[in-house]
């Protein structure tokens, strides 16, 4: 997949995931939020909790999941820490990391709290 096609496919996947969160009462507060450590695809809120969402698109959900590396997770953690620094409770803000997997047919599988140890 060329860079431009891949970029647009990623945007389409992110939009589909954002709609799911919005419709389930967890409004998306930011898209492609960028900090010094990296970028977070989507940031949603569920009450006082902040949800950091990494969207992965590939031919299958399994292939999409395989594209998430430890290094990428570390960058997301760093960017999330930067985002939380701007919250009233700072690092004490309730938060979680979800991964949204999108397959070639546009089907979405959301893994809540995916980065839990």
Curated annotation (Swiss-Prot):
Gene3D superfamilies: 3.40.1350.10. Disulfide bonds: none annotated. It comes from the Bacteria. Transmembrane segments: none annotated. One of its GO terms (molecular function) is nucleic acid binding. InterPro entries: Restrct_endonuc-II-like, tRNA_endonuc-like_dom_sf, UPF0102_YraN-like. Coiled coil: none annotated. Belongs to the UPF0102 family. HAMAP family: UPF0102. NCBIfam families: PRK14676.1 (NF011269). This is UPF0102 protein RSKD131_0118. The lineage of its organism: Bacteria, Pseudomonadati, Pseudomonadota, Alphaproteobacteria, Rhodobacterales.
């Amino acid at each position: 997949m060329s860079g431009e096609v891949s970029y647009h496919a990623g945007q389409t996947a992110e939009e589909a995931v954002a709609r799911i969160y919005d419709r389930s009462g967890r409004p998306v507060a930011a898209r492609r939020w960028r900090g010094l450590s990296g970028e977070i695809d989507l940031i949603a809120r569920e009450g006082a909790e902040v949800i950091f969402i990494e969207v992965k698109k590939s031919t299958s959900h399994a292939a999409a999941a395989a594209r998430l590396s430890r290094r990428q997770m570390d960058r997301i953690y760093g960017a999330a820490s930067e985002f939380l620094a701007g919250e009233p409770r700072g690092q004490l803000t309730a938060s979680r990391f979800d991964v949204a997997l999108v397959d070639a047919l546009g089907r979405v599988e959301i893994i809540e709290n995916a980065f839990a140890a």
